[in-house]
Amino acid sequence: MSVPPAVPLLEVRDVTKSFGNVAAVQGVSFPLYGGEAHALVGENGAGKSTIVKMLAGVHGPDTGSLLVGGEEVSLGSPSDAKARGIAVIYQEPTLFPDLTIAENIFIGTQPRARLGMIDRSAMNTAARALFDRLGVPMDPDRLASGLSIADQQLVEIAKALSTDANVIVMDEPTAALSGNEVERLFKVARSLCASGSAVMFISHRFEEIFALCQRVTVMRDGRHISTSELAGLTVDDLVRSMVGRDLGALFPKIDVEPGAVVLEIENLSRAGVFSDISFQVRAGEIVALSGLVGAGRSEVMQSAFGVDPRDSGDVRVRGKSLRKGSPKAAMRAGMALVPEDRRQQGLILDMSIERNATLTRSSALARFGFLFGGRERRSAYEWTKKLQTKYARITDPVGVLSGGNQQKVVLAKWMATAPSVLIVDEPTRGIDVGTKAEVHRIISTLASEGVAVVMISSELPEVLGMADRVLVMREGRIVSELSRSEADEEKIMFAATGSEAAA
């Protein structure tokens, strides 16, 4: 790595921030150098979001200082941060949908023609120049409504460049992106670094951190643990720094001899979505559905569970066919579905933790048609305790929990039904590494107890670390089946993309 310049573009120096009696950040320091991508990592609650809000001008530090180009500055508002060349790109951008791309980029700074009118021609020309600089084609006259998350993020980056930002903070930007969209974003980030900007990258995905970044800062419990070059570090090194202990294994897979066939899917088809899907899952087996976004993985299992329709095919649990289009029939047969979007599909965010954890057993817990709080609370306590769910009060709204603890509540809800088939769709998306290991442990333990598990995952390390078999889907069809010993990243990606025949 080349030697960075002596003066960083931005430096966080010994900052502290508390909210009431809770210290969110304590004595954190790190530099951001021009020409580098710098990862900021830590478990949920480590203080990363507070640091981002400091840099964005939302919160000021209680003590310590922020320096831009070696000069101490006060970022009392987002406009102060913008004036100092700092821009934050969030996971879910907030563009104005009824304005054009160019209007979103230059809102508040539109070029003016004579008589003070907005010069739309000049604005569109300037927007095109920004996208040319980023190396991405985009029509500046298009409305922002309907843009993908990936394209919205590029508009936000173009907006940052339009204000001469040279410190770009990317806060979990890849969580909702496909593989191709991630690579395009990385290409843009690398071009920003090549032009002398500093990029701060926040992500739970280690493969992305190692692919993009040159330096990493680790936080734990609001404190600075280390800042170092990534070269020579391993994922295990980062995990140990982040969680303060050796996780033993991020993928604590328990080897189990599979039992009898529990789930059978035969010739399942839905026009335009998936076709002729057939596979079996045995007791104690974890079968992963892998493939690119849009391959039809989630749709197949939602159809099998009865949430989505199917045109033809059969779904059997322990040899008994299920009535199609009936989640109730699937549940009675012993199936459970942990959906991809836990906030929209798996939880009722305004409802309490205890009520969410017992939703699947409301009828069983009721007496004479009424649900009494004591029985509900005991059941919720039992399952949230088993899953080591962290919360202040079990009566709190589930929406206040971290992503990892929300996922545990969804799992608790289904584990309380004693399922024989568990479908988990992107089970660790958006949760920190320590909680990922806990979720993996839960899934592995369930399999060891005889549950047949179908895991849909876009994270290849998770697929390879947890699955006994891997079924690869492409364009709505299963194109490859790989045993645990056969599967590797190359074979899965070749099959998923159709670029080469997989074994």
UniProtKB/Swiss-Prot annotation:
It is an enzyme of class 7 (translocase). Keywords: ATP-binding, Cell membrane, Membrane, Nucleotide-binding, Repeat, Sugar transport, Translocase, Transport. The keyword RNA-binding does not apply. InterPro entries: AAA+_ATPase (IPR003593), ABC_carbohydrate_import_ATPase (IPR050107), ABC_transporter-like_ATP-bd (IPR003439), ABC_transporter-like_CS (IPR017871), P-loop_NTPase (IPR027417). Its EC number is 7.5.2.7. It comes from the Bacteria. SUPFAM superfamilies: P-loop containing nucleoside triphosphate hydrolases. GO terms for molecular function: ABC-type D-ribose transporter activity; ATP binding; ATP hydrolysis activity. Its main location: membrane. ATP binds at residues 42-49. It catalyses: D-ribose(out) + ATP + H2O = D-ribose(in) + ADP + phosphate + H(+). The keyword ATP-binding applies. Residues 10-246, 256-500 form the ABC transporter domain. It is a peripheral membrane protein. GO terms for cellular component: plasma membrane. CDD domains: ABC_Carb_Monos_I (cd03216), ABC_Carb_Monos_II (cd03215). It is found in: Cell membrane. Part of the ABC transporter complex RbsABC involved in ribose import. Responsible for energy coupling to the transport system. The complex is composed of an ATP-binding protein (RbsA), two transmembrane proteins (RbsC) and a solute-binding protein (RbsB). Belongs to the ABC transporter superfamily. Ribose importer (TC 3.A.1.2.1) family. This is Ribose import ATP-binding protein RbsA. It comes from Rhodococcus jostii (strain RHA1). The lineage of its organism: Bacteria, Bacillati, Actinomycetota, Actinomycetes, Mycobacteriales. The gene is rbsA.
